[in-house]
């Protein structure tokens, strides 16, 4: 029974406090009551925390969009995360494209120029897909998780303490209002005691809130380190992708634009060579780029002269008829041009064997 009486008294006291705060808040909004202002330093800290929260949320959400553009996939990952379960593993976009290219290449025939190139491109796309997964995983751990921890942890604590500070201020100002209205000496003495108590509680809560808010500077320093980790992860990812594409370009070789045209029709537009960014120089130092213009020039000179050149075979090639020469990848043969020959072919010699060979399967040597 005593416990029930205590609970009823506490409930009545809480209701009275809530009503007092509501009245004080309303009168402040109507300009009918004075309001205790926070000191300028605390106001600046509150503003800094709010600004940090807003921009952290925006950066976090946009980073998630960057790493996973598919909104349905993001929603699925969110639900699995809330259920504390691992999302099912699926191919990402580069891996899926790579698989399609490999399947198409095998369907068209690995021995054909197009089929072989599709397979090699598909393998590279799969490598890029793996690098993409590593970027997402590293970025999630080193960048997104710390940002999310701030939003869902530190800032929630700040919000809770800030709300408590607001309530303590309302209690203080309500007590000050009652003191002003007190006429009887006994009531005035009680109101003065209430003001002293609420002032002490307000000052204590203001100090707690201030200490929490001053931690925002440490949060910025921590997020700066996380940002550096994110930049490093991106740099590694783009360097890997560049290296993979440079490897692919080297495997495919750089040939006249007839290789890129349909129905073996010649095109006069030169293929642009890839320029190596200085930031990736270290990643690609061991992979020299083959200049398209040099190769094009070399073949043009060979066709216009009666001389011959050594050439490295890029892929296996099975001769379609007796006028062609079968080739093995990485072997070196002698090539030359004869009058009236199709622009996509050269004559090749290997010992006593000779026959037509497709330009797209060759890399001219100096």
From Swiss-Prot:
Entry's localization field: Cytoplasm; Golgi apparatus membrane; Mitochondrion outer membrane
InterPro entries registered for this protein in UniProt: AH/BAR_dom_sf, BAR_dom, Endophilin_SH3RF, SH3-like_dom_sf, SH3_domain, SH3GLB1_BAR, SH3GLB_SH3
Coiled coil: 34-54, 160-185
Keywords from the named record: Apoptosis, Coiled coil, Cytoplasm, Golgi apparatus, Lipid-binding, Membrane, Mitochondrion, Mitochondrion outer membrane, SH3 domain
Domain SH3: from-to ranges: 306-366
Biological process annotations from GO: apoptotic process; membrane organization
Family: Belongs to the endophilin family.
Record remark on domains: An N-terminal amphipathic helix, the BAR domain and a second amphipathic helix inserted into helix 1 of the BAR domain (N-BAR domain) induce membrane curvature and bind curved membranes.
Name of the protein in question: Endophilin-B1
